[in-house]
Amino acid sequence: MALLTAAARLFGAKNASCLVLAARHASASSTNLKDILADLIPKEQTRVKAFRQQHGKTVVGQITVDMMYGGMRGMKGLVYETSVLDPDEGIRFRGYSIPECQKLLPKAKGGEEPLPEGLFWLLVTGQIPTEEQVSWLSQEWAKRAALPSHVVTMLDNFPTNLHPMSQLSAAVTALNSESTFARAYSEGINRTKYWELIYEDSMDLIAKLPCVAAKIYRNLYREGSSIGAIDPKLDWSHNFTNMLGYTDAQFTELMRLYLTIHSDHEGGNVSAHTSHLVGSALSDPYLSFAAAMNGLAGPLHGLANQEVLVWLTQLQKEVGKDVSDEKLRDYIWNTLNSGRVVPGYGHAVLRKTDPRYTCQREFALKHLPQDPMFKLVAQLYKIVPNILLEQGKAKNPWPNVDAHSGVLLQYYGMTEMNYYTVLFGVSRALGVLAQLIWSRALGFPLERPKSMSTDGLMKFVDSKSG
């Protein structure tokens, strides 16, 4: 499994195999996620301790002046267990690619897309769950979903001009009143028990997020109509779409896919790093996740799919809905020559087509192949990369996840673009909270990198070159 694959190098192949078999046996025999974690964590603590004792002084990489001024881009400085972003392959969740997750993770009865519950189980344990384990998780989240009255009152009294992401962040912060970790910490709980309380808070928060998000949507766009009640027989995504007011089974399938693929993207992006940083101060999961959502609300992180839709709409307005390849090329070149970018193309790390784009494209080809906006997106996919390569400036001319997601949401009637980042946030909770559990389990300390002033950096460089 992903947590133990390197054990052979430290403990010997035979002992490592025993650990893997023991973990798999625990996974197969229990539907209680916390029980499985209680079995896995001591083994991983031992593995990490041995690794650090043997290789703690090993140099991982060099830091350049450009890295320090350039947003620490490419700097290796975090341990993040749940996912790894490969420039050529895209994201891998505990070693599994998106196509593998689509194939292996359990699905709803009659459905074709993976259930986010299965992805969360994978992120936490490193194991593909059984249908029974996923069903347990769906029911567990349904049990924990109710919102406290003060949060409901708060959401119902927000002004309608308050951005949905501001409402989400504020409501999650207010849920901190329910934190079992915060209460236990104030009472002096032993640090070896931290992960157990972080687990409980994380499970509660994930369970409540669809209720919070749906209430925001109904208050802003559906005249404050009721979100209804959680159905314990339905999965997490299905309950979410019901509360939003959507009854189309295809939209529920899209939501399962969307919430799965947006869940995690290794640890260096703004929302993941923020939750990791704030959590390292032993802020509870509610405060850590609220901080992450404030980062996600920034236009450089969570608003890209809105920018794509605005650009596509403007394109259609200027050149028409049924545009030739030649006219489309001219429009793209005009966009680039005016100093603007083509939204939805390029990525800070990826150097190939984002597999999150590809799986959304496959969904559209299956369910909405004749939709005019999808046809335009598909047409751009044929044309834009070659133009960007010809221009010679882009390191990655290929589309990313944001080039497609907004078009799919629009097709099923969710046209409120300001709300899209809330969906992103609900999904991202799966990844960052899974990691937060492991950060406390492995005893990660307060994050405190060293900063330097420009003058200090110049003196340092002079001393090196002199």
UniProtKB/Swiss-Prot annotation:
GO BP terms: carbohydrate metabolic process; citrate metabolic process; tricarboxylic acid cycle
Q: What is its EC number?
A: 2.3.3.1
Family in the record: Belongs to the citrate synthase family.
Keyword terms, alphabetized: Acetylation, Methylation, Mitochondrion, Phosphoprotein, Transferase, Transit peptide, Tricarboxylic acid cycle, Ubl conjugation
Pathway connected to this protein: Carbohydrate metabolism; tricarboxylic acid cycle; isocitrate from oxaloacetate: step 1/2
Q: What class of enzyme is it?
A: transferase
Tell me where it mainly resides. mitochondrion
N6,N6,N6-trimethyllysine modifications at: K395
Q: Where is the active site?
A: H301, H347, D402
This protein's assembly is summarised as: Homodimer.
A Pfam family cross-referenced in the UniProt record is Citrate_synt
After translation, how is this protein modified? Methylated. Trimethylation at Lys-395 by CSKMT decreases citrate synthase activity.
Query: What else does UniProt say about it?
Result: Citrate synthase is found in nearly all cells capable of oxidative metabolism.
Q: Which SUPFAM superfamilies match?
A: Citrate synthase
| Binding locations of oxaloacetate | R356, R428, R448
Question: What organism is recorded for this protein?
Answer: Bos taurus
Motif range (SIFI-degron): 2-21
Subcellular location(s) of the protein = Mitochondrion matrix
> Its Gene Ontology molecular function terms?
citrate (Si)-synthase activity; identical protein binding
An annotated GO cellular component of this protein is: mitochondrial matrix
Out of the domains of life, which is the source?
A: Eukaryota
Name positions with the PTM N6-acetyllysine: K76, K321, K327, K375, K382, K393, K459
Per the record, what are the reactions this protein catalyses? oxaloacetate + acetyl-CoA + H2O = citrate + CoA + H(+)
Transit peptide interval: 1-27
Question: What's the protein name?
Answer: Citrate synthase, mitochondrial
